[in-house]
């Protein structure tokens, strides 16, 4: 029984020592994130749709900052996001990638034709924001409040029962386009 407690104490001391070493190493050898990547990532819409060719907003921000990727590939963010990134990086704005720029693009949501849905769940697996609910061999539906209109669920559907449709603006869904409202920062003078 005495050997048992010695073994427990030895393993506990080893765990404590290795934990302290790992804690010290994590602070001593920490790699600082690129602040430009952080700022670009904050500007991007965080829809994680992949329309830019990257698996999410963070990898796209890293590609812009580190690899010189074009700043005009974010379809959900549109021109407003591209202009903010251009201002941050102090580069010339570029037209949107392959599309005519629109100041206020219509919000699109996926709609499933429930009569043709076979419940294969391929659209659920493709949706980056989990806006589609349903079960295997059961009818699926899209939660329009969560849908970003990224179009990633349309191609995997074997019965082609998913389409994107514009959302009609109602008093409940209408929002100010805050990107068109000019904002000026006025420095405050402190008098002592």
Swiss-Prot record:
Give the binding site residues for [4Fe-4S] cluster 2. Answer: 117, 120, 123, 157
GO BP, sorted A to Z: electron transport chain
Recorded hits in InterPro entries, A to Z, give:
4Fe-4S_dom (IPR007202), 4Fe4S_Fe-S-bd (IPR017896), 4Fe4S_Fe_S_CS (IPR017900), 4Fe4S_Ferredoxin_RnfB (IPR050395), Elect_transpt_cplx_RnfB/RsxB (IPR010207), RnfB/RsxB_Proteobac (IPR016463)
Cofactor(s) needed by this chain: [4Fe-4S] cluster
The catalytic activity of this protein is classed by the Enzyme Commission as: 7.-.-.-
Sites where the protein binds [4Fe-4S] cluster 3 = 127, 147, 150, 153
Q: What is its main location?
A: membrane
Q: Which UniProt keywords apply?
A: 4Fe-4S, Cell inner membrane, Cell membrane, Electron transport, Iron, Iron-sulfur, Membrane, Metal-binding, Repeat, Translocase, Transport
Domain 4Fe-4S ferredoxin-type stretches: 108-137, 138-167
Q: Where is this region: Hydrophobic?
A: 1-26
Q: Which PROSITE patterns match?
A: 4FE4S, 4FE4S_FER_1, 4FE4S_FER_2
Q: Which GO terms describe its cellular component?
A: plasma membrane
Q: Does the keyword Transport apply?
A: yes
Name the Pfam families for this protein: Fer4_21, FeS
Compartments reported by the entry: Cell inner membrane
Looking at the record, the residues that make up the 4Fe-4S domain are 32-91
The residues listed in the UniProt record as binding [4Fe-4S] cluster 1, with positions renumbered to this chain, are 49, 52, 57, 74
Cofactor descriptive note? Binds 3 [4Fe-4S] clusters.
Q: Name one GO molecular function term.
A: electron transfer activity
Q: Which SUPFAM superfamilies match?
A: 4Fe-4S ferredoxins
Task: Check the record and name the HAMAP family matching this protein.
Answer: RsxB_RnfB (MF_00463)
Summary of subunit composition and partner proteins: The complex is composed of six subunits: RsxA, RsxB, RsxC, RsxD, RsxE and RsxG.
Function of the protein:
Part of a membrane-bound complex that couples electron transfer with translocation of ions across the membrane. Required to maintain the reduced state of SoxR.
PANTHER family, sorted? ION-TRANSLOCATING OXIDOREDUCTASE COMPLEX SUBUNIT B
Which family does the UniProt entry place this protein in? Answer: Belongs to the 4Fe4S bacterial-type ferredoxin family. RnfB subfamily.
Q: What is this protein called?
A: Ion-translocating oxidoreductase complex subunit B
State the taxonomy lineage.
Answer: Bacteria, Pseudomonadati, Pseudomonadota, Gammaproteobacteria, Enterobacterales
- The record's gene field reads rsxB
């Amino acid at each position: 029984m005495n050997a048992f407690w010695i073994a427990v104490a030895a393993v506990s001391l080893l765990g404590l020592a290795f934990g302290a070493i790992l804690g010290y190493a994590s602070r001593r050898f920490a790699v600082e994130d690129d602040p430009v990547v952080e700022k670009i990532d904050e500007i991007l819409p965080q829809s994680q749709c992949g329309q830019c060719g990257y698996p999410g907003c963070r990898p796209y921000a890293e590609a812009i900052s580190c690899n010189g990727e074009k700043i005009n590939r974010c379809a959900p963010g549109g021109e407003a996001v591209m202009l903010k990134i251009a201002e941050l990086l102090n580069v010339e704005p570029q037209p949107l990638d392959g599309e005519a720029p629109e100041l206020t693009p219509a919000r699109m949501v996926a709609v499933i034709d429930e009569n043709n849905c076979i419940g294969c769940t391929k659209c659920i697996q493709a949706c980056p924001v989990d806006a589609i609910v349903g079960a295997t061999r059961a009818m699926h539906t899209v939660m329009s409040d969560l849908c970003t209109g990224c179009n990633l669920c349309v191609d995997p559907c074997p019965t082609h029962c998913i389409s994107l449709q514009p959302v009609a603006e109602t008093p409940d869904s209408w929002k100010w386009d805050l990107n068109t409202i000019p904002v000026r920062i006025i420095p405050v003078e402190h008098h002592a």
